Amino acid sequence: MPLHQYAYFALFSTHTSADDMTSQLGITPDEVTVRGSRITKPAVIPVDHSWMVVCREPGLRVDEQITRILDRLQPHTDRISDLSRRLASTGGGAVLNVVRYFNDTDQAELGAADAPNLFGWHLDRKVLGFLSATGAELGVDEYDMAEDEDAR
């Protein structure tokens, strides 16, 4: 079954911009969103600013992607924790999010012999400690991209 997945850690706020978060943390994010930057119709506005560190490296299990992210962030846990708690006081916060697309035939597949098993993952004590220290939530988004049989 084709599987495309990635993980990211994000700080988010309706009041504090990603640039301000970067200044406070001293860490350059991989991606940012700006509140109101993806307006396609008057009703669609991102609800917050986001500062993200992302791992999209193919061929890694989710826990391996999360380890890559935390290897970058853990030296800054105290600053991330302080900022996350300030953001949470105004409705923002922190999240570690996992995004998985099952049956994603649009993604290039490795040869069957080379394809790693990407199913199954776990969070070790190191990850759980970081989530607890930073007050981050865990989000998991999973999508079945198989063609709808009724649409044929």
Where are these regions (language model features)?
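Acidic (Asp/Glu-rich) sequence patches and key acidic residues
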Residues: M1-R152
